[in-house]
Amino acid sequence: MLAYVIRRLWQMIPTMLGVVLLIFILFNWVGGDPAYILAGKMSNPEQIENIRKQLGVDQPYYVQLWIFIKQILTFDYGASWSTGESVSQIILTRLGPSLTLLIPLTILQTVISIIFALAVAAVRGSLTDRMVMMLCTIGMSISILVYIIVFQYVLAYQLSWFPVQGWSDSFTENLFKFSLLPILIMLVVSIAPTLRLYRSFVLDEVNQDYVRTARAKGVGESRILSVHVLRNASIPIITDVMSNLPALLIGAFLIERFFGIPGIGREVIIAVERSDFPVIKAITVYIAAATMIFNLIADLVYKVVDPRVQLK
């Protein structure tokens, strides 16, 4: 397994270089001259030239690319154009609030979806199964903005069960006070598509020969579903969970914006509004690297869950 991990990490290098080159091209050739963006409409040529020198964009492209690569390797992306704050510090300080929301959400979403998927698979084709799928379809058709507005107005404003907005320096207060309503909203939004997907995974396994063999041997339906079917359905479930994990690192854009949560999602929106390229580039590289690492972790988890999986 160690040899496989080393080989995969080595293979990530050219992929990451391709991502870095693509980001560099997009922001330097397609994104326009940052000096004009920072200087504004009332600038003169001398101001534009001074800004170019400060940013280093007056140098040849290969020099700029090398500077960008060094920034990635040292995790030092310079300062934000809009606030002057260190970009690395922005990422580190905004990551905590996003993870406070999204780690509990991922755990709850996965566990609840698996339980309900097994339950509806046990009564597949019944009225209950059709009703659950219909509710999932309705839930998926409603915009997250509707959920945010309704839940915020009814549960926070009218009933005062949750704070409307806010965030503090206390992790406990954030988790058990300010995060509850945002997590509830995101759970309601995400549970419908996840449940439908996991149900399809379970039903694919229910139709396999080993299930019919287990039934013929007199194994109970609940044991077949909870042990045999779940074990084999866990591979695509792990794939789904791992593919969604990079989203943990960019936060929930709308939720963080509406609830005033200082996470990475809200920071991305602010950076885009202000054309803060250093912040956007850093987060883009950061997500690309995280995606490749999570894919590697998923492959290793496959081996742990099912020893029959061969890592090649």
Regions found by a protein language model. Give the residues of each.
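Alpha-helical transmembrane segments of integral membrane proteins
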Residues: 2-4, 91-128, 144, 171-312
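Hydrophobic alpha-helical transmembrane segments of membrane transport/permease proteins
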Residues: 15-66, 159-178
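Hydrophobic alpha-helical transmembrane segments of multi-pass integral membrane proteins
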Residues: 17-22, 61, 103-107, 150-151, ...
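An internal, D/E-rich "acidic patch" concept
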Residues: 58-114
